[in-house]
């Protein structure tokens, strides 16, 4: 399935007293990577919301292998797990600048109608973009 690499530099404020990235920051890193994945596909998250579709996170899983630290440059590999329906699922691998695998993660998001506040199927234009090579 489609994949994309994003890069994030760890800021000092994102670390804890032990000098490692505070675990709560990983959700933000994954969101950055997801939005960049969509943009690389030609999808504007802002435009999608303006068209009445939102994508709240339904499930988030993280497995920490090694610690990310201040000033690390993280490479986040984002992959679509399978063709979306009502849900869209991503897997992630986060590496540091030394190409060490730090974190494995996955997220499941739900396509929702902003107007009706209920789940909907993945918009057809997204499915069409996923079919393109």
Place the predicted regions along the sequence by residue:
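Ser/Thr-centric signal marking residues that sit
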Residues: 15, 78, 107
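Short, positively charged
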Residues: 45-46, 52-53, 71-74, 91-93
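Intrinsically disordered, low-complexity regions of eukaryotic proteins
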Residues: 16-18, 61, 91
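HotDog/MaoC-like acyl-thioester-processing domains
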Residues: 2-6, 39, 69-70, 81-133
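Hot-dog-fold acyl-thioester-processing enzymes
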Residues: 2-57, 114-133
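Active-site beta-strand->loop segment that positions catalytic residues and contacts the acyl thioester
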Residues: 58-73, 79-85
């Amino acid at each position: 399935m489609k994949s994309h690499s994003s890069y994030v530099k760890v800021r000092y404020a994102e670390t804890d007293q032990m000098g490692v990235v505070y675990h709560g920051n990983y959700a933000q890193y994954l969101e950055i990577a997801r939005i960049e994945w969509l943009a690389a596909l030609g999808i504007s998250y802002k435009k999608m919301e303006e068209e009445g579709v939102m994508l709240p996170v339904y499930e988030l899983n993280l497995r920490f292998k090694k610690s990310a630290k201040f000033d690390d440059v993280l490479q986040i590999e984002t992959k679509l797990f399978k063709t979306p329906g009502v849900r869209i699922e991503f897997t992630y691998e986060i590496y540091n600048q030394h190409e060490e695998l730090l974190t494995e993660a996955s997220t499941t998001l739900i396509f929702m109608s902003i107007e009706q506040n209920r789940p909907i199927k993945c918009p057809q234009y997204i499915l069409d973009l996923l079919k393109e090579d």
